[in-house]
């Protein structure tokens, strides 16, 4: 970005789920570290100052899972890179629960589970949840005290805050995977840029940044994708997808501006857009608000878009050219099947565009099962991330 010179750079990630039965997760994490060092070396500012894993780094909280993460830090990080960890529900899955997880964490990592670090003059506050993904009175008091210290140092500078669950009412994924027990504290500190995980929501979803009282950012997953919509034909977890490997790279300059860039380890590339927080301490300047739902930008099917329906028995499979959009990506599609004889709707199905995959396929498809014999008209509409329905649709006739 022009006229932006970093004085701080860090990785914010979540949900590594280290598990020796699934070695690709830690392998992809190690690969991501190497890629970010190479990226840093290509820049004028060459440091990678910190790496954060924001909870659920150990799939079942077992000793060897925590040790694999510690080994990754020891073997992959350079001496001038600080690592920061929080724990949450999956670390507590071990035998002995939360108490055992706390003991293991201290023994293996040698640091407290709640931390306040200052890196290059910027405050990093990280808190481990309790009782799963909750915050008791002791945690709340600690959070407030540490935030007070950070803001007393400089109220006109971002404060980077880390906890595993999303804050309800903020980033994508918060509906099912959010908590509200510290909202009343955080909203008094607009300087906060809050990083969270838990949901496995894609980092390239533009709803993974949100601003209202403060700035919130989702940090992705190294396990599977999960999405925060409940009308899809296969539930919230898209089937037959490779394990995710995503995080965000965060940079700050001497003015306190913060640049956030979603990254995909599997394709070794950034997603091609970035989020700039100009003045984190001033909510009146926030741009990533719910006003984005008022967009006039809508998906559309190109003139040469194709649609085909193949019938096998009483099942029909539709495949079509993906819609286009001038900003972001297409979120999902709705397929409506009407009986030709009376135009009555007999099926409605919704499914994702696979926008969370860096290299989106050029076509999309879905199967409509168990249709009675007859003639039908099928219609496909597209939708963006902001409930912005496509300006046109694709239509095909078929018979079973």
Which positions does each model-derived feature cover?
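Binuclear metal-dependent phosphoesterase catalytic core
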Residues: 207-303
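Conserved aromatic anchor
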Residues: 316-329
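Beta-strand-rich modules
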Residues: 368-388
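Extracellular fibronectin type III
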Residues: 385-400
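Active-site-proximal segments of metal-dependent phosphoesterases and phosphodiesterases across multiple
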Residues: 21-27, 150-199, 203-209
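N-terminal active-site segment of His-dependent metallophosphoesterases
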Residues: 1-64
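Extended active-site neighborhood of metal-dependent phosphoesterases/phosphodiesterases
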Residues: 62-154, 178-188, 204-241, 245-252
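Active-site neighborhood of phospho(di)ester-bond hydrolases with catalytic His/Asp-centered motifs
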Residues: 12-14, 49-56, 82-89, 160-164, ...
